[in-house]
Amino acid sequence: MTTNNDILIKVEGLKKYFGNNEVLKGINAEIHKGDVMVVIGASGSGKSTFLRCLNLLEEPTDGKIIFDGIDINDRNVDINLHRRKMGMVFQQFNLFPHMTVLKNMILGPVKLLKKSKEEATKEAMELLERVGLADRANDYPSQLSGGQKQRVAIVRALCMNPEVMLFDEPTSALDPEMVGEVLEVMKRLAKDGMTMVVVTHEMGFAREVGTNVVFVDKGVIVEQ
């Protein structure tokens, strides 16, 4: 049974305009610790905008996003402190092309979490081992397949020890034969109790892993 103490993210009256176009029309949602919220909907429904508002990659026009008890949409809040607790995985991987896999992974922990290079490297190698990519640590992103890049992007986000992972259509840019390897990593994360918000078209994943499946249409949650 969940209680108010379990709520990690609470969204109240979330609105987002792009010019005169109202993309989000007052969304309310609760994400509890350990939840896997799967967000589905047609292209242009507002689902990716909703996800990107959760860590203020898109600045909401109105509403509250309460994360760990703090309204991060308040102008007095240091959003960067809270972003560190939110891992983000994009459709296009967003790895730094001029850095090896390992350097991509340890950059955040060393620069932002002030970990030693040795500690960050040890943790990064353990995570790469978990996703079967320890032998690619010294390769560059251009040497990896799309599925391998996305697995690296996921464990790179995990290196920051996030409280929640946000996935914006993580498999939609992949060749069909590579989708499974990425979903497998995400399923294991869910099994380990990671709180996740996933925008996806993968209905099998939604049914198997989602604790809460929400359908967004024209900027509102029409079903959950």
Model-predicted regions and their roles:
Residues 6-9, 15-224:
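ABC family nucleotide-binding domain
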